[in-house]
Amino acid sequence: MKPTEEKIQGNASDLPVYLFKQGNNCEAYRYFGAHLETRAGEPGVVFRVWAPHAVAISVVGDFNSWKPGSHPMHKVDGDSVWELFIPGMKEFDVYKYCVTTRAGDLVYKADPYAFHAETRPSNGSKVYDISGFAWHDEAWQAAQKKADVINGPMNIYEMHVGSWKMKEGNKPYNYAELADQLIPYITEMGYTHVELLPVMEYPFDGSWGYQVTGYFAPTSRYGTPKDFMTFVDKLHAAGIGVIMDWVPAHFPKDQFGLYNFDGEPCYEDPNPKRGEHKEWGTMVFDFGRNEVQSFLISSALYWLEQYHIDGLRVDAVASMLYLDYNRKQGEWEPNKDGGKENLEAVAFLRKLNDTVLGRHPHKYMIAEESTAWPMVTKPASDGGLGFNFKWNMGWMNDMLSYMKTDPLFRAGNHNKVTFSFFYAFSENFVLPISHDEVVHGKGSLINKMPGEYEAKFANLRTFFGYMMAHPGKKLLFMGQEFGQFAEWNEAKQLDWMLLGYDKHTELKNYAKTLNAFYKDHPAFWQVDYSWEGFQWIVPDDSQQSVIAFLRKDTAGKQILVVCNFNPVLREGYTLGAPVAGTYKEVLNSDDAAFGGSGAVHNKPVRTHKKPMHGFEQSITITLPPMSTLYFEVPTKRTAKTAADKAKKPGKKTTKAAPAEKAVKKPGRKPKAAPEAPTEKDAKKPGRKPKAAEAPAEKPVKKPTRKAKAEPEPAAEEAPKKRGRKPKAAKE
């Protein structure tokens, strides 16, 4: 290398290293790792790595027969950053760093900043050039920058790349092939986004990707980095957003990974009472260390910028926030103020979200947070954590508990259906029915439903209808949309053969219809996080297990939602109506096309002047057993103006009708309550609505069509031991 080139290279390294050590290098991957480069006219690869405790480091690989010391690195800053340019190395060459520790040991480490890696069980890093990919998603990107992130539709299909669908011989598709299989299905079903379980490189299949060793490398199980770019590009071209699970909370102890990278803690907290999750067998990042902040924030931006990912679902946030998370007395130490909050992690999350959303306000930063921590989705400047969405784990736990309850006993658990509405607008919530709920012996979603075969489907249809209408964005794990009976197994594809049976095909059709209804009706997504988009009508008919409420859009259009959580036909059910006029049934979960009985369809029903539930008029309808109904609410009629009358001279005119009185709200608007890990019974609204009128209960009518017989699901085997244990909600 010529002296002038050396000088330029030296100066160029000063700024990224300085920013890295300050915790402010948000693109550290451009400097660290392995990069193809030409020096003095000779092509090769420059390697850079951070190892503050190392005595010596050399690059080893096939090119030097993995001989330690043959290609030694040197410090570029006289402190902790090591560099070496090796001429002649090329793309896809495998390498590792051989680190000499202060104890005199040699440890072989994969590159923390590698763009590509060997496929397990091998674990070497690979030289890879991520530049030069031809993207075709300009229209998608432009539209996203103009979109209203908070007040737009979001209906997420959560999936595992390797087990959604497989080739013959139980072999997974690569990223590009999977896109061609997935796009027609997602388009047909009408989901707006897919969310991928972690695709960052990981060694153990049974961890599902949550034990990451390569924070800048898409797992090579399914192809190259550019194959993954192709996957994202194709989905964007089809109008489908892509969200990724991202895991900054912890990392595994694999010897080739980040653990004790140079023989001592670098990435993990050195305090054993803070630096390890013993239950998970993983290490906790040192969130207060500047170099670790640069590493993690660079990883987040890398996926959003280099792979055009639309958002990150940040895993296990609760475990980051609390020093006593899953730790017994004596296993943790309080913070400097004597509390249990991890102050460094809180500061890191605020910095992460400020940085990401400061650059990309149209991206999603979604917290998987299961406790009562306040203001998760409020700006850091206001004391919040700065996410723009949060999973509503309280709603999920309450509703799955309620749906598992025998309908005979649901009256005594009615608060589980209504409690979430008391805090629904305290955060920007996503309603998650995720992979965590269909593993580890918990059973699939349909197998959580009580009753025999037909009853399970009826319960699930009712739940899906309720979920779609509840304020908040939506997320459903793959396979639940067609009623997979078996728990999810990452080693097998979904049970697509079930679509050969009527009930499963009909359930899939129902999910598809619900998704289309959601997308086509802004009342279900435009005002998700304010009382302006929701109003109770019947919150407390616990004896009949019925609720009714309104969803509203900004133009004043409304949908009336009525849920009957009991397998009992209810004729003559009267409830308050917000507007006088004709109400039309627009969706019925008990429709025969969806696998229901098809016995009841409400014809357009006019209001009658009978005040109820705080409204001046009411309607009387029939509720099918175990069902969710949607009704189109008539628009408010206004009085004719003088100009309107003058349009038809000579004709007899009538007096303009008096303006309608303001609609009286039912009861007192409940104050939003914070979500709590152990949720107490909800208080009833300030004003108790009149009891809905209903005659004696009638027996359920049997289905009018006979479904194709399906074998009874076999008893499920006990789940295999996973690399990652299920996360317990914070008590």
Explain the meaning of each model-derived region:
Residues 74, 205-209, 253-260, 377-378, ...:
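Short glycine-biased active-site loop of nucleotidyltransferases that positions the nucleotide triphosphate
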